[in-house]
Amino acid sequence: TKDAPSRERQAEIFKKVIAIAESLNLPLVIHSRDAEQPALDMVKHLDKVVFHCYSGTLPTMKEAQDSGYYISLATNVCRSGHHQILARNVSLDHLLVETDSPFLSPRKGRNEPANVLDSVRLIARIKGLEPQEVAAQTATNTKRIYNIR
């Protein structure tokens, strides 16, 4: 919620979640809709952060990337002009893709994991790249952030 007492409570809980991720040396995955900058300000001391389902501003996205953090774009990039602008501006080496299933479908109806290919194709077109290049780099990024061998 957006009222001050609720935001303060959310910040206190978020600090606890940050501490858990830090103590376990795990990436912190943040869904910070309408609070991207405050969330970023709270995690700048961390090494591994993913901004899940990012929908914030370009300056905050750039600041997150400059901190080495990942920006994850959901399949709504296929139908949202704002998300297409984000896709154009995110650096490929800081990009992750996701569906956020069953939500944010690229078309009418329930979303599903296979739809991530729609995002990859569109992001490739926006960036003037081949879909295979976007798929390969986002797979590499995913393995890197989650320490998958």
Where are these regions (language model features)?
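Mid-to-C-terminal alpha-helical segments outside catalytic/metal-binding sites
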Residues: 19-20, 116-149
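Short acidic/histidine-rich active-site segments
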Residues: 93-112
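Active-site gating loops and adjacent loop-to-helix segments of metal-dependent hydrolytic enzymes
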Residues: 1-2, 99-102, 115-120
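Active-site metal-binding loops of divalent metal-dependent hydrolases
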Residues: 32, 53, 75-77, 101
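Active-site glycine- and acidic-residue-rich loops that bind
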Residues: 70-83
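Divalent metal-binding pocket/active-site signature
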Residues: 1-67, 85, 106-114, 129, ...
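Short amphipathic alpha-helices and their capping/turn segments at secondary-structure boundaries
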Residues: 82-92
